[in-house]
Amino acid sequence: MEEQPRERSEAGAEACEEKRGLSQAAEERIEDRISLLLRLRAQTKQQLLEYKSMIDTNEEKTPEQIMQEKQIEVKIEELENEIEDVKSNIEMKSLALSRMKLSVALRDNMENMGPENCVLTDDMKHILKLQKLIMKSQEESSELEKKLLDVRKKRLQLKQASRSKLLEIQIEKNKQKEDVDKMENSEMIKTMKKKLQTEIKITTVVQHTFQGLILASKTNWAEDPALRETVLQLEKDLNTL
């Protein structure tokens, strides 16, 4: 009879060692992933610093450069969120591993206890029950954190899409302005402006001539509505039209 508790204890210890080995391997994989993410974040930040130093040498940033800079910043933020998520998972798994070890130890002690220790046994059962509830709550919390991370990623994607759209609009406006400037500075537009100024000058001379003729005729043009309208039209400055 004494050999059975000992065998159970040894089996529990072996199971605990096996779980510990699997958990350690999982932790090593997660730590490798964190190291990779940290290296990627450092490389991305370095690229951003180099990019900014190159841009600072210019007097003004182009919309394309601003867009690339914002994309790098969004990528850094995504990496930081992913690192925080991995760290949180490691902490959760470490706590779960500790509780598994404690559960195995408590179970072994309960099997070795006699009837006289029933009160302590009940306490241990209650502790194990609480541990299961805690682990369940932590799993639910982990799921909520994953959902929160997904929401953050979607928010970043929307922010990036909004910035990209605004930059596209700005690029289009700048292009239209450049096209207008090119048209205004083109030889055809210059020639048309010269012709227009010549026509304005000729028309102004004609206006003054008609005004002189009307005044020289000593006609009371104010009493004639049609003539009054003509005189008022002749007084307009064509350069302001």
Swiss-Prot record:
Region (Disordered): 1-24
Location in or out of the cell: Nucleus; Chromosome, Centromere, Kinetochore
GO molecular function: kinetochore binding
Bilayer-crossing regions: none
Any one GO BP annotation for this protein: kinetochore assembly
Post-translational modification N-acetylmethionine, affected residues: M1
Phosphothreonine: residues carrying this PTM: T62
Predominant place of localization: nucleus
Listed Pfam families: CENP-H (PF05837)
InterPro entries the record matches: CENP-H (IPR040034), CENP-H_C (IPR008426)
Keywords: Acetylation, Centromere, Chromosome, Coiled coil, Isopeptide bond, Kinetochore, Nucleus, Phosphoprotein, Ubl conjugation
Tissue: Abundantly expressed in thymus, spleen, uterus, ovary, testis and muscle, and weakly expressed in small intestine, lung and stomach. Barely detectable expression in kidney, liver, skin and prostate gland. Not detected in brain, heart or adrenal gland. Also expressed weakly in various hematopoietic cell lines.
Record flagged with keyword Cell membrane: no
Family membership: Belongs to the CENP-H/MCM16 family.
Protein name: Centromere protein H
Organism: Mus musculus
Lineage: Eukaryota, Metazoa, Chordata, Craniata, Vertebrata
